[in-house]
Amino acid sequence: MPAIQNEIAQLTAELNQHNYRYYVDDSPSIPDAEYDRLLNRLKALETEHPEFCRPDSPTQRVGGEALAKFEQIKHLKPMLSLDNVFDEQEFTAFNQRIVDKTGKDLSYCCEPKLDGLAVSIVYRDGVFERAATRGDGQTGEDITENVRTIKSIPLTLRGDNFPPLVEVRGEVIMPHKAFDALNERARVKGDKLFVNPRNAAAGSLRQLDSKITASRALGFYAYALGVVEPETWELADSHYGQLEQLRSWGVPVSQEVRGCETVAEVMAYYYDIQQRRSSLEFEIDGVVVKVNQIAHQLSLGFVAKAPRWATAFKFPAQEEMTLLEGVDFQVGRTGAVTPVARLKPVFVGGVTVSNATLHNADEIARLGVKVGDTIIIRRAGDVIPQIVAVVAEKRPDDAKDIVFPAHCPVCDSEVERVEGEAVTRCTGGLFCEAQRKEAIKHFASRKALDIDGMGDKVVEQLIDKELVESPADLFRLTASAMTMLERMGMKSATKLVAAIEVAKQTTFARFLYALGIREVGEATAANLAAYFKTLEALKAASAEEFIKVDDVGTIVAAHLAHFLAQPHNLEVIDKLVEAGIHWPAVEEVAEEDLSLKGQTWVLTGTLTQLNRNDAKAKLQALGAKVAGSVSKNTDCLVAGAAAGSKLTKAQELGVKVIDEEALIAILS
């Protein structure tokens, strides 16, 4: 067999196996990007050597075979898939083909490419009759009873202006919130977790017991009309218009659908929704672009398996395969020993990734991952890269278990894992150089003492050269001593000493936050300062007293009590006060001054007249909780210049939105 023919045969067999796992088992073994690469290679070879194209090639059909355990339904007309484009150049070429065939620039309808399971739903005389999966495009699986359980799908159409028979085509998805809840239930039971919402939606839809499907909180969005009878029934003459008709009949249609008149508008839509991707309630992997006018769709027609008038404009891959080459153990500010996977560098989500946290021993056990494994790495938006699965069939014979060290890799102190906690910790405290470095970085950080010029590299050098051992030592530094540091001349050293002096004037809340007590963030520190008002009162408090403070539960109270019971911590606090750190007295706040008590506020965009931290502190002083994200519980969003996805979400949820001028008026 010629080498090319052999490669085509091997690629066909491999892709068919991946198709079966993806469409039938709902258990994909490789990322979408890897599948696309294999498929594109096969397409290229078949184009060059059509005589070797096999009848079972995945390029000759759509999707996978119907499951035998469900009844099979022949579609009223084929459910085809879409061709893909992966960048602006490829989309421009797609548009040019449209222009060449029609002789004119056409408008487009754009919508999110939902990452779920395509289904066909038939209504007869306005009543839900049956539903089927796409299957192989010609025949699908009868999932009528399962789809009937999806609450967003109407069992009867609204109004009376719908055709006697109408087929609705769309995507069944699992919203992020439902996916997280499903996996949390599985985690509690010790069951296997779903890798992503797409797998969860597909697995839920193919349950033989529809009660299980009903418990999974699936969603649905229509993306097209299928067969309509009689064919003479008057429908909108544009794709966008037909989606609006579906919406008027009570069928869910995504609010993200947009009409675009030009290629520039399509590109703007693509980049906008890509930026907002992580804030959407559902998973998407690109944008579907369709010629808007139905007459032009009909004239453009179809190729063998896809319409000429539509394409899927895919986002850069968020998942890739790579090799786990080793594991390093890092020690953080609170002594947490974190396993970090060293990866063979891989480009994913727009960046090259060479490391990924494994979090803790429980996560390693859940993944079943070993050194030497081929793993799937995921990076969505600005989210930290994470390992989501192991490709078990690629495991080498010499793969090694990941074993936590018995002693700290930095200071050799014993490590311990407290019962009920997932984290393993070094017991060395400030004796541990790693913990000292992280503690002092935190102490000097912008939200703590805010020492201008005291960056991470400066702190690391101060520790390495034994100029500083605790935060209190910062206030004994001299300019001449700091000239020992790399790239630190006398002028820079003098400036840094002056910044340290300025940092002595702070607030009680910032001081408490700077101490780095476990679980004590900015908001908790502010609540503690407001409640106790003085350092002496705080030091004298018991765990029972701490629990009386807003947002302080038993765990945080225990951490506070433990921290303040350690002689070396009290010694550091005393030395800091002796060094001259001070703050204005915390004044009693009258109840009438807490005008925002119980409210949740969010800040977004750039504030031009207020420092963001000052605005946050002033809102908290009025009793507000300042959150980092918008939800249905948000009372007000302050939108500065260039506000982004938070503003969009607030508008969708009907949250009150004000500008910076209105905020200043409230705070004055």
From Swiss-Prot:
Residues 591-668 form the BRCT domain. InterPro entries: BRCT_dom, BRCT_dom_sf, DisA/LigA_HHH, DNA_ligase, DNA_ligase_AS, DNA_ligase_CS, DNAligase_adenylation, DNAligase_N. Zn(2+) binds at residues 408, 411, 426, 432. NAD(+) binds at residues 32-36, 81-82, 111, 134, 171, 290, 314. Its EC number is 6.5.1.2. It catalyses: NAD(+) + (deoxyribonucleotide)n-3'-hydroxyl + 5'-phospho-(deoxyribonucleotide)m = (deoxyribonucleotide)n+m + AMP + beta-nicotinamide D-nucleotide. It is an enzyme of class 6 (ligase). The active site is at 113 (n6-amp-lysine intermediate). Its cofactor is Mg(2+); Mn(2+). Signal peptide: none annotated. The keyword Ribonucleoprotein does not apply. One of its GO terms (molecular function) is metal ion binding. DNA ligase that catalyzes the formation of phosphodiester linkages between 5'-phosphoryl and 3'-hydroxyl groups in double-stranded DNA using NAD as a coenzyme and as the energy source for the reaction. It is essential for DNA replication and repair of damaged DNA. This is DNA ligase. The gene is ligA.
